[in-house]
């Protein structure tokens, strides 16, 4: 296939993370009512495989309503969030269930032949939506197909055929699937704790950055709220940001800045042919990156090597002409390494003279940014159904290029093309992805010089799997001399205050560790940062 043939368009999409009325009704009465609804079979429609099917049927309906001929679609790439843990199904079981529904439905007549259904197993966790998207790109670029569908569903409440739901604590453990098993076992590390520690380190690194991100979060939620008032939001949380309880859940991580558990679906139709007229949106770059599952093995807790690799690869493929052409960014989440890494790489590559903090505070980048409009869909902080999240963000970017779905039309000249970036974070930056879209007049988009190439998922997935296996087998970490205290985080629980902390090595790496409450209480009464500390190979503070 020649370089000029490597063209993929986003033709349309769907998304919906709004909690169904059924869930609101069933959960309002607490666990007893939820159990009763489940035993009566009334919760079936919110199982992950049901959301997947609902997303597909709505995507087909949308394409037909738009007059798009999908009969040449030969593959449907599907996924559900944490299939083993949340849905309690294997990937092949999900695919078989989908195939059965398709064979028995009226929708099969929309296709010349029954499409194959693919569900690629992955460790990508919260970034897993980029995997079926990447598979669809490979369908079109490497397997000479003309159209490919991407559909994902998820229910992070854990409602499935075997149970009415799981507890938030169990969900937190599942979300930590890409955190080093050794760190989880000995330091009780998880996503919230690592996120809080990273935020604490960011406070020390650049307090103005935190102020910028807080303002950014408020503006994102406000924009989502305004879309919802007009009935146009696909998000889960759409309340006014000032009505959201600004409660610290793990110091200094606040409720308003975190992504709520969600249920819903998202889908896209990708094709090698553009729309017959008007504006077109094309995929021009995609990248992936993986990093060590333990922060002990990373050069920095604030800058994501995985995200940097993903963004850099996507940029090389997309061949943006300059900073002025980058108009839209949809961040997976706003705290803190996603925008810090993503924007650092983008702004440096495109010649911006200033820091990420300056770009945000000066409103060069923001929801109403002078140069780049960022985070208008709200990202994961307004609803995180895991696998569908990246697909929803891609759909929101698509709508912004078309000036549809409540987004104002971009001010583009007749031959001008705008670019947009979408980030996807797996775990605490263990498995990240990035995509770049281009939008504009059909003829201008068609002639772009891009070098789109799907990433090698099997390679990245294998690297991650080997790392997780090695961490699971680890009996003791190598602890360097000269460690000092970096940051102490804590949360209030029914059993009392629970602590989590990181120690810093002389070369700048962070080690998670735990100690007794009395040890941390004494330290918090002092200016503890930089205090010498010793920790054991199993990440316990040597007290006394």
Language-model-detected regions and their locations in the chain:
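Soluble or luminal CAZymes and related metallo-dependent hydrolases
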Residues: 51, 128, 306, 389, ...
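Short coil/turn segments at secondary-structure boundaries
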Residues: 120-128
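Conserved "HGTGT" condensation-loop signature of ketosynthase/thiolase-family condensing enzymes
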Residues: 1-121, 138-142, 152-262, 266-267, ...
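Active-site histidine-anchored catalytic micro-motif
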Residues: 131-132
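Short helix/loop segment immediately N-terminal to the Walker
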Residues: 407-413
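Glycine-rich and small/hydrophobic secondary-structure elements
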Residues: 384-391, 395-399
């Amino acid at each position: 296939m020649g370089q000029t043939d490597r063209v993929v368009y986003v033709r349309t999409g769907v998304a919906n993370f709004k909690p169904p009325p059924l869930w609101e009704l069933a959960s309002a009465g607490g666990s007893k009512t939820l159990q009763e609804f489940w035993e009566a079979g009334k919760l079936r429609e919110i199982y992950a495989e049901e959301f997947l099917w609902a997303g597909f049927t709505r995507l087909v309906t949308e394409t037909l309503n738009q007059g798009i001929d999908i009969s040449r679609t030969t593959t449907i790439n599907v996924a559900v969030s944490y299939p083993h843990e949340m849905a309690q199904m294997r990937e092949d079981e999900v695919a078989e269930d989908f195939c059965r529904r398709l064979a028995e439905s009226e929708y099969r007549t929309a296709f010349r032949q029954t499409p194959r259904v693919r569900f690629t197993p992955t460790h990508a966790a919260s970034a897993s939506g980029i995997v079926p998207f990447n598979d669809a790109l490979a369908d079109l670029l490497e397997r000479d197909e003309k159209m490919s569908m991407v559909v994902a569903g998820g229910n992070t409440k854990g409602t499935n055929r075997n149970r009415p739901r799981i507890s938030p604590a169990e969900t937190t453990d599942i979300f930590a699937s890409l955190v080093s098993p050794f760190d989880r076992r000995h330091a009780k590390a998880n996503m919230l704790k690592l996120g809080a520690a990273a935020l604490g380190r960011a406070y020390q690194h650049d307090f103005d950055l935190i102020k910028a991100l807080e303002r950014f979060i408020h503006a994102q939620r406000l924009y989502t709220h305004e879309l919802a008032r007009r009935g146009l939001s696909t998000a889960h949380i759409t309340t006014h940001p000032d009505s959201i309880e600004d409660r610290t859940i793990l110091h200094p991580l606040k409720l308003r800045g975190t992504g709520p558990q969600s249920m819903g679906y998202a889908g896209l139709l990708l094709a090698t042919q553009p729309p017959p007229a008007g504006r077109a949106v094309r995929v021009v770059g995609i990248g992936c990156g993986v990093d060590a599952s333990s922060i002990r093995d990373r050069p920095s807790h604030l800058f994501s090597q995985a995200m940097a690799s993903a963004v850099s690869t996507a940029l090389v493929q997309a061949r943006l002409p300059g900073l002025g052409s980058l108009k839209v960014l949809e961040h997976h989440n706003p705290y803190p390494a996603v925008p810090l890494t993503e924007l650092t790489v983008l702004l440096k590559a495109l010649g911006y003279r200033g820091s990420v903090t300056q770009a945000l505070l000066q409103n060069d980048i923001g929801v109403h940014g002078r140069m780049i409009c960022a985070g208008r869909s709200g990202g994961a902080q307004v609803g995180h159904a895991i696998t569908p999240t990246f697909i929803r963000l891609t759909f929101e970017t698509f709508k912004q290029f078309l000036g549809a779905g409540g987004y104002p039309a971009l001010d583009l000249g007749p031959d001008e093309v705008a670019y947009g970036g979408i980030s996807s974070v797996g775990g605490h930056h263990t498995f990240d992805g990035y995509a770049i879209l281009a939008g504009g007049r059909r003829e201008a988009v068609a002639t772009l010089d891009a070098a789109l190439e799907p990433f090698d998922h099997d390679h990245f997935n294998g690297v991650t799997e080997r790392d997780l296996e090695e961490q699971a087998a680890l009996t003791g970490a190598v602890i360097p001399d000269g460690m000092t205290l970096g940051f102490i985080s804590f949360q209030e629980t029914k059993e009392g205050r629970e602590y989590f902390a990181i120690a810093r090595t002389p070369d700048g790496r962070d080690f998670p560790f735990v100690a007794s409450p009395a040890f941390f209480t004494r330290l918090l009464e002092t200016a503890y940062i930089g205090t010498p500390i010793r920790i054991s190979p199993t990440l316990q503070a040597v007290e006394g």
